[in-house]
Swiss-Prot record:
Catalyzes the ATP-dependent phosphorylation of N-acetyl-L-glutamate. PANTHER family: N-ACETYLGLUTAMATE SYNTHASE, N-ACETYLGLUTAMATE SYNTHASE, MITOCHONDRIAL. InterPro entries: AceGlu_kinase-like_sf, AcgluKinase_fam, ArgB, Asp/Glu/Uridylate_kinase, Glu/AcGlu_kinase. This is Acetylglutamate kinase. It holds the Pfam family AA_kinase. Its EC number is 2.7.2.8. Signal peptide: none annotated. The lineage of its organism: Bacteria, Pseudomonadati, Acidobacteriota, Terriglobia, Terriglobales. Its main location: cytoplasm. It is an enzyme of class 2 (transferase). It catalyses: N-acetyl-L-glutamate + ATP = N-acetyl-L-glutamyl 5-phosphate + ADP. It comes from Koribacter versatilis (strain Ellin345).
Length: 261
């Protein structure tokens, strides 16, 4: 199976969870699955910005990324966090290579059109599927930081959920899994929804039932499913050790999203 895993910045702050996640990635790869990891790192980025005397700025929940913030993101996400995560996967016996979107021409970004200009905030314009296939053929797990270069030569900060969705869509992954700090997608009563089809996803978005960070995540899920990804799962990061069992039985926690129910 082709599996794309996205681990959020909050989970990366927990060393025990990261260790658990890396062991799971190694186990999946050793079982013959092709695994690709995408990560963000917003918490570490904000912390480093403050240490450098740069106050993080947000507009409607989205990070304002001026040139200085973008450069620090390259250092923190594309450097420290990326290499630490790739090394941690390697430490449990699975070869992994740390990349950002510009490495191996993995993907090309473009400035994201938004009502308010947020600076160097981008979206994925194209993906080099052959580069991913080459790494998988050589038994390597790509670990991708959510940054990519545009045709204009500028680096752009990419929403990690959107990057994971774009990469999963490009390689037509069997499953895309988001490991988050929430138990799953909730309905209007606050109860976790176990399984959703595209029609229900669109209804939740249209009726304003989902908000905050879950909104772009569901939009990313929708695009992945529409592009042919087999299924998407939104799971609490604390359940990382149970990932292998998800391919053997129905999902027991979190939310599974499919094209049709």
């Amino acid at each position: 199976m082709k599996i794309v895993l996205k681990i959020g910045g909050a989970a990366l702050e927990n060393k025990d969870l990261v260790g658990q996640f890396c062991t799971t990635v190694a186990s999946l790869a050793k079982d013959g699955h092709h695994v690709l990891v995408v990560h963000g790192g917003g918490a570490a980025l904000s912390r480093t910005l403050k240490e450098l005397g740069i106050e993080p700025k947000f507009l409607n929940g989205l990070r304002v990324t001026d040139a200085r913030t973008r450069d620090v993101a390259l250092m923190v996400l594309g450097g420290l966090l990326n290499k630490q995560l790739a090394a941690a996967i390697g430490a449990v016996g699975q070869p992994a290579i740390g990349l950002c979107g510009s490495d191996l021409h993995l993907c090309v970004a473009r400035k994201k059109p938004l009502a308010e200009d947020l600076g160097f905030v981008g979206e994925i314009a194209s993906v080099n599927e052959e580069a991913i296939a080459h790494l998988w053929a050589n038994n390597a797990v790509p670990v991708v930081a959510s940054l990519a270069q545009g045709a204009d030569g500028e680096f752009y900060n990419i929403n990690a959920d959107e990057m994971a969705s774009a990469l999963a869509a490009a390689c037509i992954a069997d499953t895309l899994i988001f490991l988050t700090d929430v138990p799953g997608v909730k309905d209007a009563n606050g109860d976790v929804l176990n399984r959703l089809g595209l029609d229900r996803i669109e209804s939740l978005i249209a009726n304003g039932i989902v908000s905050g960070g879950m909104l772009p995540k569901l939009e990313a899920c929708k695009r992945a499913l529409q592009a042919g990804v087999g299924s998407v799962r939104i799971l609490p990061a604390t359940k990382a050790e149970a990932l292998p069992s998800l391919f053997e039985s129905p999902i027991a926690f979190g939310t599974e999203l499919v094209a049709t129910v």
